[in-house]
């Protein structure tokens, strides 16, 4: 029986993949005949027969998209087909800006509530305030069951200079406000401040077109404030533009030092070296990484580690050592195809095996840098200073805490709004952390809110209480001091940050 099913499925799968080859080839190189003549290929004939003769209506676009996805799965985990809508969103992240109304919001009981209005942005100019609830946009109802932030975002975003009419609820009154959309920056650096009198801290979320420029401004500011050493936090940074990682690495390394090289079956070796005197070639450097630090983050970390320029601290990185190039397709989509591997200055490819093709008999190579560190290939970037996976990971995996985390934003925003005069008197983010009376009051209010809404029946452990209280305090700090406040509170008791400084 099992063999019969396989026999039936196999021709379908083969046909599916063959169709993909045709479609991708047509999109990428439409002017080239696949077989050197003008006759229709077998693939084209099959496509036309399906299109014109198949028993049921066929959504050819959907079939094509699914077929491409199946083909790419056979290659590697990082070759990707992006539909037009997905491409637009991915491009925004790499561009470092998007077009919208300039607000942050959270969903509270299926209603989008404005939690922050960008200064001098389109919404502030129009009179939108924190606490306003979004009811409609251009007549489209935005209060609905099972609402999502993606749905709300897609409604209020739009082309620059276009107008969106918002219906908002403020103090039980309904208001109509027109907002003229504009370009909104999407910073790559989430936070930069002095950890102590001599240590500058920069948290880089992604490598976008603005990352290097933002990095240089942050370094200049920190040095002017007295920073003599630098902590660059790449935790959770999944990568982005290789060129930005190379430019940032250049600021740490002497001129002409190799930063990274790429090479592929169809791509000749291409070396990237430091080209100019760097802004931070002297002074201690700490790079923080975790299991979500990938790609361009690993390029930067690998260069720093291979040249003994700084210490890598945290957990072993993701292990993505493949380079993608983007090809625009005729239907408005794009193919991000792996064309090369990248190698650290010592020659390490840190790409972990994929498709369960790990060769257990293969003897992995290791390399020694001038610090006599043993550095392995095909295993991501292993930190010089390893930090055990924090208790946070185990905590967040518990159902009790997972549910609680979804309610922190709503609780914190309301607490902040109800006590705004109190927070206006606070002068630094760390003053919140040192205020034990505030911590007790927050926890008492949290427990009261939880019991009132019957959100949990399981008592919180001491560790869970500490974890939640710190995150509520950090979220409160964000409402007043933005991301710098948030990370100053969280980093105060962060084991990776503190270990790096010891």
Model region roles, listed by residue range:
Residues 259-261, 311-315, 345, 349-352, ...:
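Acidic/polar loop patches that form or flank catalytic/metal-binding clefts of enzymes
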Residues 1-7:
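Short, Lys/Arg-rich N-terminal segment immediately upstream of the first membrane anchor
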Residues 2, 27-39, 43, 47, ...:
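Cleft-lining beta-strand/loop regions that shape enzyme active-site pockets
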Residues 348-502:
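Conserved functional hotspot residues or short segments at active or partner-binding sites
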Residues 296, 319-373:
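Polar, glycine-rich mid-to-C-terminal structural blocks
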Residues 10-27:
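Hydrophobic membrane-insertion alpha-helices, especially the h-region
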Residues 134-135, 164, 350, 375:
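Generic structural signal for buried aliphatic residues
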């Amino acid at each position: 029986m099992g063999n019969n099913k396989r026999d039936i499925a196999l021709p379908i799968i083969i046909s599916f993949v063959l169709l993909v080859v045709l479609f991708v080839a047509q999109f990428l190189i439409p002017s080239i005949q696949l077989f050197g003549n003008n006759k229709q290929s077998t693939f084209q004939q099959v496509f036309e027969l399906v299109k014109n003769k198949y028993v049921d209506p066929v959504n050819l676009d959907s079939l094509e998209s699914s077929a491409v996805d199946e083909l790419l799965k056979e290659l590697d985990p990082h070759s990707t087909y992006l539909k037009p809508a997905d491409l637009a969103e991915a491009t925004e992240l790499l561009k470092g800006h998007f077009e919208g109304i300039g607000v942050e919001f959270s969903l509270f009981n299926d209603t989008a509530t404005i939690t922050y209005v960008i200064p001098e942005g389109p919404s502030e100019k129009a009179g939108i305030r924190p606490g306003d609830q979004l009811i409609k946009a251009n007549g489209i109802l935005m209060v609905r069951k099972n609402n999502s932030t993606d749905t709300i975002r897609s409604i209020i975003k739009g082309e620059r200079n276009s107008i969106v009419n918002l219906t908002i609820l403020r103090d039980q009154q309904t208001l109509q406000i027109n907002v003229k959309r504009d370009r909104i920056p999407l910073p790559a650096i989430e936070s930069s401040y002095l950890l102590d009198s001599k240590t500058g801290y920069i948290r880089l979320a992604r490598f976008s077109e603005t990352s290097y420029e933002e990095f240089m401004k942050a370094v200049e500011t920190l040095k002017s404030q007295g920073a003599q050493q630098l902590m660059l936090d790449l935790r959770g940074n999944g990568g982005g533009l290789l060129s930005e990682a190379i430019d940032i690495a250049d600021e740490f390394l002497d001129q002409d030092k190799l930063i990274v090289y790429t090479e592929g079956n169809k791509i000749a070796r291409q070396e990237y070296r430091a080209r100019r005197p760097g802004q931070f070639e002297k002074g201690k450097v700490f790079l923080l990484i975790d299991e979500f630090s990938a790609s361009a983050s690993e390029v930067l970390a690998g260069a720093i580690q291979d040249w003994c320029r700084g210490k890598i601290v945290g957990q072993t990185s993701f292990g993505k050592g493949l380079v993608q190039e983007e090809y625009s397709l005729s239907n408005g989509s794009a193919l991000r195809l792996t064309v090369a591997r990248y190698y650290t200055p010592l020659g390490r490819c840190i790409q972990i095996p994929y498709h369960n093709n790990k060769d257990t008999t293969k003897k992995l190579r290791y390399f020694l840098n001038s610090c006599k560190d043993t550095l392995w290939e095909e295993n991501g970037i292993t930190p010089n200073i390893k930090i055990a996976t924090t208790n946070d990971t185990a905590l967040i995996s518990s159902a009790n805490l997972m549910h609680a985390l979804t309610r922190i934003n709503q609780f914190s925003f309301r607490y902040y709004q109800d006590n705004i005069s109190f927070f206006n008197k606070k002068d630094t983010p760390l003053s919140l952390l040192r205020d034990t009376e505030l911590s007790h009051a927050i926890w008492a209010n949290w427990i009261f809110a939880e019991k009132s809404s019957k959100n949990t029946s399981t008592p919180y452990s001491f560790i869970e209480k500490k974890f939640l209280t710190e995150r509520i305090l950090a979220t409160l700090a964000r409402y007043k001091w933005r991301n710098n406040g948030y990370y100053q509170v969280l980093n105060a008791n962060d084991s990776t940050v503190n270990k790096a400084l010891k």
